[in-house]
């Protein structure tokens, strides 16, 4: 009788684990335990993929999660930036940015929200001013855009001189002769 109870208990535990669990690799668990994990040199997936792969050392040194990522202290704006990053194996389910500040003068705000972003402008706008919200998804078409991690140091991307999303790398290399996003992990030239 006790053997049946133990067998049923173990079977229930197996069913609960299989129903409520997520399959992740051991690299995420190992990276979060050492000096190279989390927000260290190999964030978030360790050094297993090598120096040039987007999830290895290159990702840790050039992305917002790693050693040289842009931080509030070095952002070249007045009032600091709003860096939002996730080094988790689980995708974030939502991001909300709300502000009830009063802005006077010319205001230009640009950024990217993950997957689907909703922007709203409410309140009284002066008659001499204008307010506009431009929303796009992907590269101007209704699709998801896939971008690789930056391989330059993180501070270079903040000033527009790096290979990151704000520098020379992504828009300049999207030419048909070199393939889509020629460079690291592109579809053309075997790069």
Curated annotation (Swiss-Prot):
Xref: Pfam families: Chorion_1
Database matches in InterPro entries: Chorion
Entry's transmembrane regions: none
Gene Ontology BP annotations: chorion-containing eggshell formation
Residue runs in coiled coils: none
GO function terms (MF aspect): structural constituent of egg chorion
Annotated signal sequence range: 1-21
Keywords assigned: Repeat, Signal
CC terms in the record's Gene Ontology section: egg chorion
Function: This protein is one of many from the eggshell of the gypsy moth.
UniProt family annotation: Belongs to the chorion protein family.
UniProt name for this protein: Chorion class B protein Ld34
